């Protein structure tokens, strides 16, 4: 993994906060709750010596040590911690583009591989219409049951999206998937794109 980028502004801000803490040898720990899922959250916390985990990875910085949670480490690839001054004082931001991306390979369970391609390839395209699709279940020897939401629910083009977009992409990427089925109630057209 390449080191997490801590901008100079973020470093100085965090060093200032650490200087106000009681005690010595306090660092910052970065971790992700529920890494590789849509609910992933990237977090920073003070890290006293007794709070370090044996498998944490140390990244030495000018004024303190950044402790990287080992489980979160692959999901923190290309992460950037920055600080920007504003009228309210300032804001610390963490950008971790891989936090919600599942780490999969060809031996991963079928459901994980389906969710991976839904999140990384299919939903970004559907988002342009305010829609998304999620996996509900896998039935009958490899048939994925999907549910559309947002602008896709009730959309008149959903059959074409399902067959020519979603199913085609998933079958190309996952050879052991046999097909897809839509479990969405499309009678609700309140937010439909078409």
UniProtKB/Swiss-Prot annotation:
PANTHER family: FE_S BIOGENESIS PROTEIN NFUA, IRON-SULFUR CLUSTER SCAFFOLD PROTEIN NFU-RELATED. InterPro entries: Fe/S_biogenesis_protein_NfuA, FeS_biogenesis, FSCA_dom_sf, HesB-like_dom_sf, NIF_FeS_clus_asmbl_NifU_C. Keywords: 4Fe-4S, Iron, Iron-sulfur, Metal-binding. Homodimer. The keyword Iron applies. This is Fe/S biogenesis protein NfuA. [4Fe-4S] cluster binds at residues 152, 155. Its cofactor is [4Fe-4S] cluster. Belongs to the NfuA family. GO terms for molecular function: 4 iron, 4 sulfur cluster binding; iron ion binding. The gene is nfuA. NCBIfam families: YhgI_GntY. GO terms for biological process: iron-sulfur cluster assembly; protein maturation. Involved in iron-sulfur cluster biogenesis. Binds a 4Fe-4S cluster, can transfer this cluster to apoproteins, and thereby intervenes in the maturation of Fe/S proteins. Could also act as a scaffold/chaperone for damaged Fe/S proteins.
């Amino acid at each position: 993994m390449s080191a997490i980028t801590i901008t100079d502004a973020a470093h100085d801000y965090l060093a200032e906060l650490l200087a106000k803490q009681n005690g010595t040898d306090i660092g910052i720990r970065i971790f992700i709750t529920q890494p590789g899922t849509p609910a992933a959250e990237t977090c920073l916390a003070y890290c006293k010596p007794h709070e370090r985990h044996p498998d944490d990875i140390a990244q030495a910085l000018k004024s303190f040590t950044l402790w990287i949670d080992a489980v979160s480490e692959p999901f923190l690839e290309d992460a950037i911690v920055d600080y920007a001054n504003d009228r309210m004082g300032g804001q610390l931001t963490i950008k971790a583009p891989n936090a919600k991306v599942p780490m999969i390979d060809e031996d991963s369970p079928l459901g994980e591989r389906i969710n991976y391609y839904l999140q990384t390839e299919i939903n970004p395209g559907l988002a342009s219409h305010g829609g998304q699709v999620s996996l509900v279940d896998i039935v009958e020897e490899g048939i994925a049951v999907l549910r559309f939401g947002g602008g896709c629910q009730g959309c008149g083009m959903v059959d074409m999206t399902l067959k020519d977009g979603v199913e085609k992409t998933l079958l190309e990427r996952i050879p052991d998937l046999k097909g897809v089925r839509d479990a969405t109630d499309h009678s609700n057209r309140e937010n439909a794109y078409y």
